[in-house]
From Swiss-Prot:
Transmembrane segments: none annotated. This is Short cationic peptide-1a. It comes from Cupiennius salei (American wandering spider). Disulfide bonds: none annotated. Keywords: Amidation, Secreted, Toxin. GO terms for biological process: defense response to bacterium. Belongs to the cationic peptide 04 (cupiennin) family. 01 subfamily. GO terms for molecular function: toxin activity. GO terms for cellular component: extracellular region. It is found in: Secreted. The keyword Lyase does not apply. The modification Glutamic acid 1-amide is found at residue 28. Expressed by the venom gland.
């Protein structure tokens, strides 16, 4: 089903954003 595919893509993007946020926090 399409919605499941979209949800997976959104989750992947969120994880990427979250990782970037964590790295930025550690850099400070």
């Amino acid at each position: 089903f399409l919605a499941k595919k979209v949800a997976k893509t959104v989750a992947k993007q969120a994880a990427k954003q979250g990782a970037k946020y964590v790295v930025n926090k550690q850099m400070e």
